Every structure is written in structure tokens, then in C-alpha cells.
């Protein structure tokens, strides 16, 4: 619902909110509806028992989000370097370092393309970490997730708002 509220789409999604409290909260809130590029990830299915399988699952999830923004591949606002990076992710030829910094890079590319900062929503961000703890690959997964989340959420000039939800208390 949060993604639907903020995300810029070709269809008018305001119809979903006209009978909700947020619509009655005033023009400041209405003005944000449907105005932002959104990165949305969920790690709800990241329940792998080995680091190799978890890494493949994380890459798959990241690649799917890049595919959701396929319009970037033909963007006149992106550099050849950006498009080469995009292609490496989409073609599954990226390195572990490329994937660790993928969300930071994707947010910068979306910001360039749309001319506005990005909203990032990550659901169950801690599921891969919990699985790493349970199955003995905690060091590998925590290093990956630290870089992935830090690249997009810390000191990112392309970030408008970041929302994380977790499963642990």
C-alpha cells in the first residue's frame, strides 16, 4: 500500500486512497501521491540453508527489481557506464561487489532518469541475516547486507525516504 501511494505510474492510483485518512490529511500529503520512483524489495522468501544459495536468492531479488525498472536501459539521461552496469545486473554477469552496491546505484539511476529522489521500501530486511545465523553463514550474509543497505540508506543524495520492516524483535 505504501508503494502504491508513492510510486509514479502510468495509471492513476489515487482512487485507492480517496476514502482513507491520508487523503483527508491535506494537500501536503496528496501532493506526494504518485510522485516518486520507488525501489521495493521483499526478502520474505530468503530461507536458504547455505550462503551460496542465499547469495543466489539475493541476486535474483535484486535483478527482479532492476527488471521492474527496465525503462532505464533506454534512458537518455543515463551514461553509457550506467547502462553497462544495468546490463551486467540484468544479464547476471555482475560481481558480488556490484550486487552489494546495486541499490545505491539503482537509486542514483532512477533519480537521474525521473529528476526526483527515490523512495526505498525493504520488507523483511532481516530474514537473510536470521537465516545466516541459523545455518552458519552469518559473517558472509551480514557483510553483504551491511554494504547493500548502507549504499542505499546512508548518505545517499538520491534518497527521499527509506522504509525497512523486519521480522525480529
Language model regions located:
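Phosphate-binding site recognition
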Residues: 1-169
